[in-house]
UniProtKB/Swiss-Prot annotation:
Molecular-function GO terms, alphabetical: ATP binding; ATP hydrolysis activity; ATP-dependent peptidase activity; metalloendopeptidase activity; zinc ion binding
UniProt keyword annotation of Metal-binding present: yes
Cytoplasmic side, ranges: 1-16, 199-744
Family stated for the protein in its record: In the central section; belongs to the AAA ATPase family. In the C-terminal section; belongs to the peptidase M41 family.
Species this chain originates from: Metamycoplasma arthritidis (strain 158L3-1)
Reported cofactor(s): Zn(2+)
Quaternary context: Homohexamer.
Stretches for region Disordered: 722-744
Job of this protein: Acts as a processive, ATP-dependent zinc metallopeptidase for both cytoplasmic and membrane proteins. Plays a role in the quality control of integral membrane proteins.
Details of cofactor binding: Binds 1 zinc ion per subunit.
Record's protein name: ATP-dependent zinc metalloprotease FtsH
Length: 744
C-alpha cells in the first residue's frame, strides 16, 4: 500500500541549469529596477546658480540690519568643486537677486548650488577675511567669516561646513559590479549552452558521447502503400526476405547484396520505399540524412559514421538508410576547397565501414540520391552498393495506380476517369500526383461540393504545373484575342499534323509568367521517336508564333512564343548534335543527359571546330525554318478552324480535348459554347460583336494573310550556304592530301 502511495506521489522536478540562470537573471533585473527607483526618489531638487550670485547674496545679507536675511549653512564640497548654500530671505530680495521684481515680503528658505573651483573659493574666503581686519580664523570658526562680513553686527550665519570624502552606497556598488557579474554569467551560460548543444547534436551523437546520430524509427508503411515501381519493390522484397530468413540464402551459398542505392528524379518514392522496407522487415531501422555527418568540427563526421555502424552491429540484423547520399558521397578531389576536407574524411570512413576489415554480416545499407552521377566510384563498386536501382517517373498505368491509391478515402465524382487524369499528367512524379489529388480536395472544400469533380481535378493539374490562375489580372480584349490566336495555332497544327503533340487543354487565363497555357501531349507515350515525329513536335511548337504572324504580321509577333522557341530549339539541337538526325550524319558532337538527376554536365563536351559549330547552327536553323514553313502551310489551309478555336477560347477562356475534337470534326462550336456566345451578344453592340468574332451576320470573315512567306527563300539560301561550306571543306581536305603526297 505504501509503495502504491509512493508511486502515485508526483515526483519533484529537478531545477535545471537554465532555471537557475533564469532565477539569477530575474534577481539582477529586480535589483537594477529597485536602484533606479531609489535613485530618482532620493534625488532632491537643488537650484543651480553661478558664483557671482553667491557673492551678491552674501552682500545682501551683510547689508541687512535684521536677521531676515540669514544663511543657515554653507557646505563646501571639495570633491566636486561646489558650494551648497541654504538661506532664508524675503520674497522681494530673492526676486531681486534673480533679476526679477516682487512686492511680497514673505520669508522663504531656499537652497542653491554654485560651481566654485578652489581658486574661486580662496577669493571668497580672502574677501571675507579682509572684511574682519585681516585676522585668519580657524576652519572651525567659520561662523565668524560671514558674521564679520556684516556691517551692522547682526548674526548672519549658521554653519560653515566642509563635506567629508564621499562614501559609496550599496546601490552604487551593485550597479558598478552588477554589469560585470551579468557579463560573466552570460559568458558562462553561452559556454555551457554550446557545450550541451554539442553533446546533444540533434538529440543524440554529440562530441563526447558515443551515441549514434542515426534515428531508430518504426514505420507503419508497407509495400502495399506503394503504387507503381513494381521492379523496385521486387528487388527490395528479396532483401527483406533475406533479413527475415538468412538461413535460406546461406544454405544456397548466396551472398545477399550489402548495399542498394536508389537513384532517380525527386518525388518518385525513394524514401517511401525505404519506409516500406522498414515496415516490412521488422528489424531495427536506422535513418540518417547524409548532411548530418558533416559539422563544423574536424573528425566529427567520421566519428558519427563509426558510431552508427557500431550501434547497427549490436542490433544486427538491421537496416541503415542514408538519405541524400550525395551530400557526403561526392567524388573525392573534385571540391573547390581541396582534397582533404571534412567531407572526404567522412566519406573515407563510410567506405571503410561498408567494406573494410570489420564484417557487417546482417547489416543492409540503403541510400537514396538524386545525383548518382556525382558519387565516388569507390562507393558504387560491388561489395558496397552492389545494386543501383533507378526509380524513374511512372508511366501511364503506374500514374493511374498512384492516383487511385491517393484517392482512397476521398469522395470522387462518378464521372471521373483516373486513366484520363493519368493521360493528362505525363512526366508527373508520384509526389506531384499526390499533390494533384490534395489540391482537388482543397478546391472541393473551397467550393463547398460534396465530391471532387472533374473540373476541380483539371484545375488541380494546372495549379501543380503552372501555379494558380491569375484571374484578377486585367487584360484588354485585344491582347486576349492575340493570346487566343496563339493558343489556337498550336491546336490547329496539333490536330492536322501526324505524329505531333496533341492539345489536351487550352486556357487563356494567365498562370505564372505565361499569358496562356497549353497542355500538349503526344498521342501515346514512347521511349523512342523518329525524325518525322520530332519534326512534327517542333512544328506544333511553332504553330502559336505562326498564327500570330498570319493575323497581325511578323512585325507584330509577341514575346509569348519564347518558351515554344526554347523547346523547339532544344529538340533541334539534340537532333543535330546527339541523335544524328541531320545532314551532318550520325556523329555525336555534344554530350548532354536527358535526365539531370541521373547526370548533368554543366560544361558540355564540345569537341569540334568553329567551322563545325557553324554548320551545326545552320542545320538547327534549317530544321526550325522548315518547321515554321510547314506550320504556316497547315494554318493557312485551316483558317476557319483557327477562328473557331479562337472564338471558343474568347467565350469560355478554357477548352479541353473533347471540345477541340468536336470543333475540328463538325467545324462549329459545341452547343454549350454556342449558347454562351448568344448570351454574350447581348452585352455588345452588333459592330463590336462582329469585330470580336470576325463575323458579318453570323458568317466568318477570313482576314488577309499578313505572314510574309519568305521562309522557303531563307531555307534555299541556307542550303546553298551549307553546300558552299561543304565544297570549301572538301577542297581544303584535297589540298592537305596533295601536300602530304608531295612530302612523302
Amino acid at each position: 500500500m505504501q509503495d502504491q502511495n509512493n508511486s502515485n506521489t508526483p515526483k519533484k522536478k529537478k531545477l535545471s541549469f537554465w532555471g537557475i540562470i533564469g532565477i539569477v537573471a530575474s534577481i539582477l533585473v529586480l535589483l537594477v529596477i529597485a536602484y533606479i527607483i531609489y535613485y530618482y526618489v532620493s534625488q532632491t531638487t537643488v537650484l543651480k546658480r553661478d558664483f557671482s550670485f553667491l557673492n551678491r547674496a552674501i552682500q545682501e545679507a551683510a547689508k541687512s540690519a535684521t536677521d531676515d536675511i540669514y544663511f543657515k549653512s554653507i557646505v563646501d564640497n571639495p570633491y566636486n568643486n561646489s558650494l551648497v548654500a541654504t538661506m532664508q530671505l524675503p520674497e522681494n530680495v530673492w526676486a531681486a537677486l534673480n533679476g526679477m521684481t516682487s512686492t511680497s515680503t514673505r520669508i522663504r528658505v531656499v537652497t542653491f548650488e554654485v560651481h566654485a573651483t578652489t581658486s574661486m573659493k580662496n577669493i571668497l574666503y580672502n574677501e571675507i577675511i579682509s572684511s574682519i581686519g585681516g585676522a585668519t580664523p580657524s576652519f572651525s570658526r567659520g561662523l565668524a567669516m560671514i558674521l564679520g562680513y556684516s556691517e551692522n553686527g547682526v548674526t548672519k550665519a549658521g554653519e560653515f561646513l566642509s563635506t567629508g570624502a564621499p562614501t559609496e552606497s550599496i546601490w552604487s556598488t551593485v550597479l558598478r559590479y552588477g554589469t560585470n557579474i551579468i557579463f560573466l554569467l552570460l559568458f558562462a551560460a553561452s559556454f555551457i549552452f554550446m557545450f550541451m548543444s554539442f553533446r546533444s547534436q540533434r538529440g543524440t551523437g554529440g562530441l563526447l558521447d558515443n551515441k549514434s546520430v542515426a534515428q531508430r524509427i518504426y514505420s507503419n508503411k508497407k509495400f502495399s502503400d506503394i503504387a507503381g515501381n513494381e521492379e523496385v519493390k521486387e528487388e527490395v522484397k528479396e532483401l527483406v526476405d533475406y533479413l527475415k530468413n538468412p538461413k535460406k540464402y546461406s544454405t544456397a551459398g548466396a551472398r545477399i547484396p550489402k548495399g542498394i542505392l536508389l537513384g532517380g528524379p525527386p518525388g518518385t518514392g525513394k524514401t517511401l520505399i525505404a519506409k516500406a522496407t522498414a515496415g516490412e522487415a521488422n528489424v531495427p531501422f536506422f535513418f540518417i540524412s547524409a548532411s548530418n555527418f558533416v559539422e563544423m568540427f574536424v573528425g566529427l563526421g567520421a566519428k558519427r559514421v563509426r558510431d552508427m555502424f557500431e550501434e547497427a552491429r549490436k542490433t544486427a540484423p538491421a537496416i541503415i538508410f542514408i538519405d541524400e547520399l550525395d551530400a557526403v558521397g561526392r567524388s573525392r578531389g573534385a571540391g573547390i576547397g581541396g582534397g582533404n576536407d571534412e567531407r572526404e574524411q567522412t566519406l573515407n570512413q563510410l567506405l571503410v565501414e561498408m567494406d573494410g576489415i570489420k564484417e557487417n554480416s546482417g547489416i543492409l545499407i540503403m541510400a537514396a540520391t538524386n545525383r548518382s552521377d556525382v558519387l565516388d566510384p569507390a562507393l558504387l563498386r560491388p561489395g558496397r552498393f552492389d545494386r543501383t536501382i533507378t526509380v524513374g517517373l511512372p508511366d501511364i498505368k503506374e500514374r493511374e495506380a498512384i492516383l487511385k491509391l491517393h484517392a482512397k478515402g476521398k469522395r470522387i465524382a462518378n464521372n471521373v476517369s483516373f486513366m484520363m487524369i493519368a493521360r493528362r499528367t505525363p512526366g508527373f512524379s508520384g509526389a506531384q500526383l499526390e499533390n494533384v489529388i490534395n489540391e482537388a480536395s482543397l478546391l472541393s472544400v473551397r467550393e463547398n461540393t460534396n465530391v471532387i469533380t472533374l473540373p476541380q481535378l483539371d484545375e488541380a493539374i494546372d495549379r501543380v504545373m503552372a501555379g494558380p490562375a491569375k484571374k484578377s489580372r486585367t487584360i484588354s480584349e485585344k491582347e486576349n484575342a492575340a493570346v487566343a490566336y496563339h493558343e489556337a495555332g498550336h491546336a490547329v497544327v496539333g490536330i492536322k499534323i501526324k505524329g505531333g503533340n496533341k492539345v489536351q487543354k487550352i486556357t487563356i487565363i494567365p498562370r505564372g509568367h505565361a499569358g496562356g497555357y497549353n497542355l500538349m501531349m503526344p498521342e501515346e507515350e514512347k521511349y523512342n521517336r523518329s525524325k518525322a515525329e520530332l519534326i512534327a513536335i517542333i512544328t506544333s511548337f511553332m504553330g502559336g508564333r505562326v498564327a500570330e504572324a498570319i493575323i497581325y504580321g511578323k512585325d507584330n509577333v509577341s514575346t509569348g512564343a519564347s518558351d515554344d522557341i526554347a523547346k523547339a530549339t532544344r529538340i533541334a539541337r539534340k537532333m543535330v548534335t546527339e541523335w544524328g538526325l541531320s545532314e551532318l550524319g550520325p556523329i555525336k558532337y555534344e554530350e548532354d543527359t536527358d535526365n539531370p538527376f541521373l547526370g548533368r554536365d554543366y560544361m558540355k563536351n564540345a569537341s569540334f571546330s568553329a567551322q563545325v559549330g557553324q554548320e551545326i547552327d545552320q542545320e538547327i536553323r534549317k530544321i526550325i525554318l522548315a518547321a515554321e514553313a510547314n506550320a504556316h502551310k497547315i494554318i493557312s489551309e485551316n483558317r476557319e478552324l483557327l477562328e473557331l478555336i479562337k472564338d471558343a477560347l474568347i467565350i469560355n477562356e478554357t477548352i479541353v480535348a473533347e471540345e477541340i475534337e468536336y470543333i475540328a470534326k463538325n467545324m462549329k462550336l459545341p452547343p454549350a459554347i454556342t449558347k454562351t456566345k448568344e448570351d454574350l451578344h447581348e452585352e455588345y453592340s452588333d459592330q463590336d460583336f462582329d469585330n470580336l468574332f470576325n463575323e458579318v451576320s453570323g458568317k466568318k470573315i477570313i482576314s488577309e494573310d499578313k505572314y510574309v512567306d519568305d521562309l522557303n527563300k531563307e531555307i534555299k539560301q541556307l542550303e546553298e550556304k551549307i553546300e558552299a561550306n561543304k565544297s570549301s571543306s572538301k577542297s581544303t581536305v584535297n589540298e592537305e592530301k596533295s601536300k602530304d603526297e608531295k612530302n612523302n
